[in-house]
């Protein structure tokens, strides 16, 4: 039986004048050189507007947004079929914005109504993509380069661009592989950082992501719940028995009764670097793999708050047995990168290198 193609679906999103158009060209060349077949789904809103389908020409904004969401999903389905039929075994579908990018243009009630009409829940709707990369608008950190001259559809002022950037990022909050590409370097450096993050997400042999972890005083849950750029998810991680030296764990992740399932594998590359790969599981696959659970480990249950703050996506983990503390984590490709802890968190100490606070150690039965 012929082996199925390995298909990755990623989203490039961001605020106005963030550099997405140039980034698409960079990714096309770099991913092709790396041996991938690359398929680009153009921005749905622009495609519709250029075809005469606009919000202004629709009866209501909600009518237009509903059409746009349905068109986005249809194109993703068609491109997925094309990827499955590709002669290449490694295919990357790159979406110029994804389905959650429409959320800032609707009320919460309108967005919920569209999900209900489509028979979708927000967790699956958001997390169906393998990774999401948010390119920050030039209006935030590279103001001298912000312009509306290169896009007739762009009319936002600096302040409006920053506000829209924040709303777009908030719409994606909670995705397990959301990365923020800010303007901390020049534009060429921004593109290099994007490419590095994309290659890491695709599982190319690359240095293992560095997670910095901090023990913090018990934070205010109400503040997290009400933060516009924060989402709560429930997580159960189960470690499996090793296979050929590879450490494996499966994860159930979601909220409000809607869950998705993953398996993560850690191994060592030929150069000694640690490599992490991840794949989505069906519920049946997840339940079957539960039979391979390591009998020396307990499942780890935690409530996670995914908080978007400036250049980083922070994760705040609450464990049932902890009454006076929580874990704050941020993942970095560059271990030397500066991390500015949000002022609402009081750090007890950093535990990045403390083996007692690694997930595997916490799961071990003692």
Regions found by a protein language model. Name each.
Residues 188-189, 195-366:
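Phosphate-end processing signature that detects enzymes handling 5′-triphosphorylated RNA
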Residues 23:
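Hydrophobic positions on the alpha1 helix immediately C-terminal to the Walker A/P-loop
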Residues 53-113:
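Conserved nucleotide-sensing/catalytic segment adjacent to the nucleotide-binding pocket
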Residues 20:
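Conserved lysine of the Walker
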Residues 2-4, 160, 166-218:
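NTP-dependent small-molecule kinase module
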Residues 105, 109-170:
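A glycine- and Lys/Arg-enriched "phosphate-lid" helix/loop adjacent to the NTP-binding pocket
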Residues 28-71:
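Conserved substrate/cofactor phosphate-moiety recognition/catalytic segment
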Residues 16:
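The conserved Walker
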């Amino acid at each position: 039986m012929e082996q199925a193609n390995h298909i990755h679906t990623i989203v490039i999103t961001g605020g106005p004048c963030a550099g997405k158009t140039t980034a698409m060209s960079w990714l096309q060349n770099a991913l092709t050189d790396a041996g991938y077949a690359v398929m680009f789904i153009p921005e749905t809103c622009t495609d519709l507007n250029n075809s005469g389908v606009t919000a202004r020409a629709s009866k209501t904004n909600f009518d237009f947004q509903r059409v746009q969401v349905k068109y986005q999903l249809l194109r993703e389905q068609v491109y997925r079929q094309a990827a499955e039929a590709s002669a290449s075994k490694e295919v990357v579908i790159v979406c110029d914005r994804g389905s959650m990018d429409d959320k800032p243009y609707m009320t919460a009630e309108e967005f919920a109504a569209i999900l209900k009409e489509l028979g979708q829940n927000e967790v699956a709707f958001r997390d169906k993509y393998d990774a999401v990369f948010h390119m920050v608008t030039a209006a935030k950190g590279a103001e001298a380069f912000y312009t509306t001259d290169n896009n007739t559809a762009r009319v936002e002022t600096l302040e409006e661009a920053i506000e829209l950037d924040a709303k777009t990022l908030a719409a994606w909050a909670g995705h397990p592989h959301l990365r923020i590409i800010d303007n901390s370097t020049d534009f060429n450096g921004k593109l290099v950082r994007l490419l590095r993050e994309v290659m890491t997400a695709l599982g190319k042999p690359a240095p293992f992501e560095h997670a910095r972890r901090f023990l913090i005083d018990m934070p205010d849950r109400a503040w997290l719940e009400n933060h516009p750029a924060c989402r709560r998810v429930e997580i159960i991680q189960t470690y499996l028995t090793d296979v050929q030296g590879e450490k494996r764990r499966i994860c159930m992740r979601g909220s409000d009764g809607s869950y998705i399932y993953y398996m993560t594998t850690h191994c060592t590359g030929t150069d000694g670097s640690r490599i992490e790969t991840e794949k989505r599981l069906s519920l049946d696959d997840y339940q079957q793999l539960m039979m391979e659970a390591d009998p020396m480990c307990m499942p780890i249950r935690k409530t996670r708050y995914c908080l978007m703050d400036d250049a980083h996506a922070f994760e705040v983990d609450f464990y049932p047995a902890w009454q006076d503390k929580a874990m704050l984590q941020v993942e970095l490709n560059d271990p030397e990168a500066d991390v500015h802890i949000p002022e609402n968190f009081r750090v007890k100490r950093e535990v990045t290198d403390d083996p007692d606070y690694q997930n595997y150690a916490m799961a071990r039965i003692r």
